[in-house]
From Swiss-Prot:
Keywords: ATP-binding, Cytoplasm, Glycolysis, Kinase, Magnesium, Metal-binding, Nucleotide-binding, Transferase. It is an enzyme of class 2 (transferase). Its EC number is 2.7.1.11. GO terms for molecular function: 6-phosphofructokinase activity; ATP binding; diphosphate-fructose-6-phosphate 1-phosphotransferase activity; fructose-6-phosphate binding; metal ion binding. Pathway: Carbohydrate degradation; glycolysis; D-glyceraldehyde 3-phosphate and glycerone phosphate from D-glucose: step 3/4. Homodimer or homotetramer. The record marks 104 as: Important for substrate specificity. It comes from Streptomyces coelicolor (strain ATCC BAA-471 / A3(2) / M145). It is found in: Cytoplasm. This is ATP-dependent 6-phosphofructokinase 3. GO terms for cellular component: 6-phosphofructokinase complex. Substrate binds at residues 125-127, 162, 169-171, 222, 266, 272-275.
């Protein structure tokens, strides 16, 4: 068989581990040929690819980013390019395409699958917001990076008697904020799923100083927002791909809390450091398993599906189910965190 692989959307620790796994399973165990499209869907639409053999994937298991490159393609461009993509699949003699990506990539994969292209998806996102899989690779690395940063920030916050508002990634879901906040022993966490009351947040932070503590750490997912009418808040806008472009929750909260508490408050934005660098052992293993099972699904002809972790097993689930909704932080999980913050 001849299999095409691509990585699309934001980069993520573990992408190279998937690519490596696909090549090893397909080439060594099945005698397949694998090609990689450069820069995601753009590479498929422009027929820009390279051959992936064992030499090409040597030494990439622990490397962050993606050796294939990635890009974002506006949805309308992909819709208009379905026939071009089909033509390139036929021209290259591909039996399957394995796209590796998050919500946007999986929606694009479903579009192509619905139009008859042989697609087997692999989910990736540091946000951990794909509903049909227990975990996505990249999440563990992002939480580890954020937790290490929070551990370090505690000492400088205490030295200067400051409130630090640490902004982590999470447009629509607060999984990184929740897990890193719990792991680092933060003093408050705000997430997109639960609009916060600025009065309650101020009181919670203020209680620490009233009790004689010298600092406070607030972890804020980038998509967190206050309850309507409780504080002046700039919600930002949208980029050309339709994604929300936020105006900075950490910056806005630092101004508000400093005015209310009379304590110096500083924003800290972790940003893309959460997406870069070496994946954790957990993410390497999960990504490798996803790649292995994606190749097996191709050989079984299970198209229109993607890999998913269910318990300790890797299962195949439909792309339609995968993109139906996001996996958000439930109230019960937030309540668990609240009792220890």
């Amino acid at each position: 068989m001849r299999i095409g692989v691509l990585t699309s959307g934001g980069d993520c620790p573990g992408l190279n581990a998937v690519i490596r796994s696909v090549v090893h399973r397909a080439v060594v165990d099945h005698g397949d040929e694998v090609i990689g499209f450069r820069d995601g869907w753009k590479g498929l639409l422009e027929c820009d690819y390279l051959k992936l053999d064992l030499d090409a994937v040597g030494g990439i298991l622990a490397r962050g980013g993606t050796i294939l490159g990635s890009s974002r393609v506006r949805p309308e461009h992909l819709r208009d390019g379905v026939e071009r993509a089909r033509g390139h699949v036929e021209e290259l003699g591909l039996d399957a395409i394995i796209p590796i990506g998050g919500e946007g990539t999986l929606k694009a994969a479903r579009l192509l699958s619905d139009n008859g292209l042989p697609i087997v998806g692999v989910p990736k996102t540091i946000d951990n917001d794909i509903a049909v899989t227990d975990v996505t690779f990249g999440f563990d690395t992002a939480v580890t990076v954020a937790t290490e940063a929070l551990d370090r920030l505690k000492t400088t916050a205490e030295s200067h008697q400051r409130v630090l508002i640490v902004e982590v990634m999470g447009r629509h879901t607060g999984w990184i904020a929740l897990h890193s906040g719990m792991a680092a022993g933060a003093h408050a966490v705000v997430v997109p799923e639960r609009p916060f009351d600025i009065d309650e947040l101020t009181a919670k932070v203020g209680e620490r100083f009233s009790a004689g503590k010298r600092f406070a750490i607030v972890v804020a997912a980038e998509g967190a927002k206050p309850k309507a009418g409780t504080m002046d808040f700039d919600e930002g806008g949208k980029d050309v791909y339709g994604h929300e472009r936020f105006a900075g929750i950490a910056r806005q909260l630092s101004i508000e809390l400093e005015e209310r508490l009379g304590k110096e408050a500083r924003p800290v934005i972790l940003g893309h450091v959460q997406r870069g660098g070496t994946p954790t052992a957990y993410d390497r293993v999960l990504a490798t398993r996803f790649g292995w099972h994606a190749v097996e699904a191709v050989h079984r002809g299970e198209f229109g599906k993607m890999t998913a972790l269910r318990g300790t097993d890797i299962e195949m689930v439909s792309l339609a189910d995968a993109v139906e909704s996001l996996k958000t932080v439930p109230d019960a999980r937030y309540a668990e965190a609240e009792c220890v913050l």
